Amino acid sequence: MVGGERFNIPVPQSRNITKNHQQLKNRQKNKDQNSQMKKTYMKKERGHGCNSLSGAWQAMQKAGKNNVHFPCNQNWSPNLSNRNLFFSPQTNQNYAGAKFSEPPSPSVLPKPPSHWVPVSFKPSDKEIMTFQLKTLLKVQA
């Protein structure tokens, strides 16, 4: 045998075909088993969740959408259902948080680190920085 020669050894094809066929069958069996497991799991899950509500659901369908009656609550007051109560501005309550309608004063804003800001300021630079700061505040608010 010389260094660059290659001998082709024939491999029986029938053996590979049966092996591939077995693998294909096994895959199909696994798929079938998995789908059956999923179906039984879903049935159990659906049945478990719906059994407790099925009586209420049937009663609601029998009664119709407009005829659903809720038990009377003694603590409920008709004054609480007034729409103006929910949508009226509540000015008598003190709110300690920030008012977002008003921009904060510049004295409250944090100062940038000294290495970020150039030492010498021209009046035009200050105007540009204030304009940029105001636009940033408008975007965030």
From Swiss-Prot:
Keyword Transcription: yes
Any one GO CC term of the record: nucleus
Pfam families registered for this protein in UniProt: PNRC (PF15365)
UniProt keywords, alphabetically: Activator, Cytoplasm, Nonsense-mediated mRNA decay, Nucleus, Transcription, Transcription regulation
Protein function: Involved in nonsense-mediated mRNA decay (NMD) by acting as a bridge between the mRNA decapping complex and the NMD machinery. May act by targeting the NMD machinery to the P-body and recruiting the decapping machinery to aberrant mRNAs. Required for UPF1/RENT1 localization to the P-body. Also acts as a nuclear receptor coactivator.
Keyword Transcription: yes
Name the UniProt record assigns to this protein: Proline-rich nuclear receptor coactivator 2
Family: Belongs to the PNRC family. PNRC2 subfamily.
Motif mapping: SH3-binding: 101-107
Signal peptide: none
InterPro entries in UniProt: PNRC-like_rgn, PNRC1/2
One GO BP: nuclear-transcribed mRNA catabolic process, nonsense-mediated decay
Localization per Swiss-Prot or TrEMBL: Nucleus; Cytoplasm, P-body
Region (Disordered): 1-51
Bias-annotated ranges (Polar residues): 11-21
Organism this protein belongs to: Gallus gallus (Chicken)
